[in-house]
From Swiss-Prot:
The active site is at K68. The keyword Heme does not apply. It comes from the Bacteria. NADP(+) binds at E80, G130, A131, G132, G133, A134, N154, R155, T156, R157, A158, K159, M213, G237. It is an enzyme of class 1 (oxidoreductase). The keyword Zinc-finger does not apply. The gene is aroE. InterPro entries: Aminoacid_DH-like_N_sf, NAD(P)-bd_dom_sf, SDH_C, Shikimate_DH, Shikimate_DH-bd_N, Shikimate_DH_fam, Shikm_DH/Glu-tRNA_Rdtase. Belongs to the shikimate dehydrogenase family. This is Shikimate dehydrogenase (NADP(+)).
């Protein structure tokens, strides 16, 4: 009996990940069976965990917090998106045995904001909260939409300034933020611990969309705060998750899934 194609998501923590359910839905659309698991790699042992996975028959992998920049360093070659971001969320095993790193986070985010949340990015003022691999991954695709400006703010100011310099955007200390943003995107992971970024509530006064890149309960603290502070519309990152997963699946298998029924399926769980 032929072994099923095997995929996985690497992270720490990763037990909460919905990626296995999402990719099973994609496989049903394609009419195939696959294996898709969760691998919690120890901090400091990510490279070894990836090597073991691909060395024992793995076909492709997703990478989540906190390993996206390590995945970039590990990949033998990179897509333009990944090179621009300096972060990788998708590893593809090539026929020559090398690993290609790609980044589909930005595709998932922009696709959800524009197509599902019906909010244009072009010509808008955008605030990004956080400066980690997740945020780096979405900036190139956001810039390609021609926003009026992108501002980045982070708890550690130097990290925000480093990212801003890399992409030619603005960095502002969190405490100095004021209104004027159409779209505010939270890319910090504090919601996993029930925390929100240390930001003034009045930045949401003219905000058309407050978006958290995480999903479910972890997004609730930020989105509740945004709503109470005046944001007109809020959304968690479920659509982004499904969208980036669909782009990864297409890179691995050459089949492009329809994300809308999968988003509805995940909401119903």
């Amino acid at each position: 009996m032929t072994a099923l194609p095997r995929y996985a998501v690497f992270g720490n923590p990763v037990a909460h990940s919905k990626s296995p359910q999402i990719h099973r839905q994609f496989a049903l659309q394609e009419g195939v069976e696959i294996e898709y698991g969760r691998i919690c790699a120890d901090i400091g042992s990510f490279a070894q965990a990836v090597s073991t996975f691909f060395g024992t028959g793995g076909c492709g992998a997703n990478v989540t917090v906190p390993f996206k920049q390590e995945a970039f360093d590990l990949a033998d070659e990179h897509s333009e998106r990944a090179s621009a971001a300096g972060a990788v969320n998708t590893l593809i095993l090539l026929e020559n045995g090398k690993l290609r790193g790609d980044n589909t986070d930005g595709l998932g985010l922009v696709g959800d904001i524009v197509k599902v949340q019906n909010t244009e990015v072009e010509g808008k003022n955008i605030l990004l909260l956080g400066a980690g691999g997740a945020v780096r991954g979405v900036i190139p695709v956001l810039l390609a939409q021609n926003p009026a400006r992108i501002v980045i703010a982070n708890r550690t100011r130097a990290k925000a300034e480093e990212v801003a310099a890399r992409f030619g955007i603005e960095a502002v200390p969190m405490a100095d933020l004021n209104g004027g943003f159409d779209i505010i995107i939270n890319g910090t992971s504090g919601g996993l611990n029930g925390q929100i970024p240390d930001i003034p509530p009045d930045i949401f006064q003219n905000c058309a969309l407050a978006y958290d890149m995480v999903y479910g309960e972890a997004a609730k603290p930020f989105l509740d705060f945004a709503r109470q502070s005046g944001a007109k519309q809020t959304a968690d990152g479920l659509g982004m998750l499904v969208g980036q997963a669909a782009a990864s699946y297409a890179l691995w298998r050459g089949f492009k899934p329809d994300i809308r029924p999968v988003i509805e399926y995940m909401k119903a769980l």
